């Protein structure tokens, strides 16, 4: 289970470009079966590619949260909207709630009830709904004889149309991004939730212990986590704070 969480935590950074080798760097979940799955099996992964990424069934991609359109990531741990992220990812929000009387950086914070949870105005949490290869909808309309300016204009125009078609009548947002040095294009559809509340966090001395001097070193003696909760409307769709 631990190995699966680590794999998916890396995959969650889907918006980052791929390295030259398929087994390095950040991986696109859509391409796991095509580029990474055989090697993942050799390393002990017992999940199927469909269990990692699926647009028709629940998969591990549905447990991954992306904060503020890519600032950080996290993972769901309950059907009540609870998820974990790193302490440093939420630190600025913890600080925004800190006062002389209630020093949450010094003492930490834990909500005893849901109504004690703290609102974070500018914090969003998004989920990947699906990815789609749209290369064949874009590249046939550009060629090497075009100026860079014209090529960009055509790609942007087609991308806008693709995004509009993918999101019309939904609460989703979307974008088209180039990969492999512009040789492939992918539509990424997300659902963004705007009501994300602080549930619990350890004191700064524990959550930030070692700071950057210990970063990427193992073992680490730090509780680098914060617990947050996503709130939705009655229909389960994104809703403003209420």
Model-inferred region functions:
Residues 1-23:
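Bacterial Sec-dependent N-terminal signal peptides
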Residues 17-242:
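Terminal presequence/propeptide segments associated with secretion/organelle targeting
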């Amino acid at each position: 289970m631990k190995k699966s969480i680590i794999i998916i935590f890396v995959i969650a950074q889907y918006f980052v470009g791929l390295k030259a080798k398929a087994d390095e760097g950040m991986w696109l979940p859509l391409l796991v079966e095509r580029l990474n799955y055989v090697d993942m099996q050799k390393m002990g992964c017992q999940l199927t590619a469909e269990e990692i990424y699926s647009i028709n069934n629940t998969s591990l991609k549905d447990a991954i949260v992306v904060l503020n359109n890519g600032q950080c990531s996290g993972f769901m741990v309950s059907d009540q909207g609870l998820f974990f992220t790193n302490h440093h990812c939420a630190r600025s929000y913890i600080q925004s709630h800190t006062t002389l009387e209630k020093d949450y950086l010094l003492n930490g914070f834990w909500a005893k009830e849901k109504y004690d949870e703290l609102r974070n105005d500018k914090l969003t949490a998004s989920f990947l709904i699906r990815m789609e290869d749209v290369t064949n909808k874009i590249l046939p309309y550009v060629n090497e004889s075009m100026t860079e300016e014209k090529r960009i204009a055509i790609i942007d125009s087609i991308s806008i149309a693709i995004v509009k078609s993918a999101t019309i009548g939904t609460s989703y947002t979307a974008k088209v991004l180039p990969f492999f040095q512009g040789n492939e294009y992918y539509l990424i559809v997300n659902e963004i939730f705007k009501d994300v509340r602080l549930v619990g966090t350890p004191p700064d001395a524990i959550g930030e212990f070692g700071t950057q001097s210990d970063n990427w070193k193992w073992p680490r003696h730090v509780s680098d986590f914060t617990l947050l909760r996503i709130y939705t409307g009655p229909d389960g769709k994104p809703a403003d704070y209420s």
